[in-house]
Regions:
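Extended, non-catalytic substrate-recognition/exosite surfaces adjacent to catalytic cores, especially
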Residues: 1-194
Length: 194
């Protein structure tokens, strides 16, 4: 098989990074749930599907200060902190505008006790990595997370090609004697019939 594990991991990481960057530009959408506002919070948290390859954890906010928040990782005996300086993407001025005690959020470990806030993207994507010389598929990723969506955007999506089709048209023109600087008449054409 031409698939390469290193390429596959690099493609998955690149796709996730791009999707997360785009999603962050859309801003923060709110915590998953608040334990003080929803009596059924434990069942809702237990039903959350999270891809283990993301290396995320589910955390509860235990203390909110202006520029520092303390968290407790659920189902583990771990506590940590989130620093506000890493959350400029949220569009908020401080933690008091962002989170409250009892909020349940996704986090990812940065260092020993420092964590960063995460959110599941609303957008998705796919990526196909091919060797341009022989056409072999080197890596194929069908989405951000198989757990959150089993639809494979790389093989199952029926997308219009858009500008991706231009090289095929240009190649056909070059094969038929056109040059890159050839002038093409772009005026309406009328043909009289009889």
């Amino acid at each position: 098989t031409p698939l390469n594990g290193k390429y596959q991991i690099a493609a998955l990481n690149a796709l996730r990074s791009g999707i997360e960057s785009y999603d962050k530009r859309q801003g923060w959408r709110d915590p998953i749930i608040n334990v003080y506002k929803d009596k059924d919070w434990q069942n809702k948290v237990n039903n959350l599907k999270i891809d283990k390859t993301l290396n995320w954890e589910i955390a509860k906010i235990i203390r909110v200060e202006k520029y520092l928040t303390e968290i407790k990782i659920l189902n583990k005996n771990l506590k940590g902190k989130i620093l506000f300086e890493s959350l400029k993407w949220t569009g908020k001025k401080n933690f008091n505008e962002l989170l409250s005690d009892g909020d349940i959020i996704f986090v990812q470990k940065k260092s020993s006790d420092i964590w960063t806030l995460k959110q599941l993207p609303k957008v998705n994507g796919g990526i196909v990595v091919m060797d341009p010389f022989n056409g072999k598929v080197k890596a194929l990723v069908g989405g951000y997370s198989f757990i959150s969506s089993e639809f494979n955007r790389a093989t199952q999506a029926k997308r219009q090609p858009g500008s991706a089709f231009k090289p095929i048209v240009y190649a056909a023109a070059l094969e038929n004697g056109f040059l890159p600087n050839s002038l093409i008449l772009d005026a309406p054409f009328v043909s009289k019939q009889g």
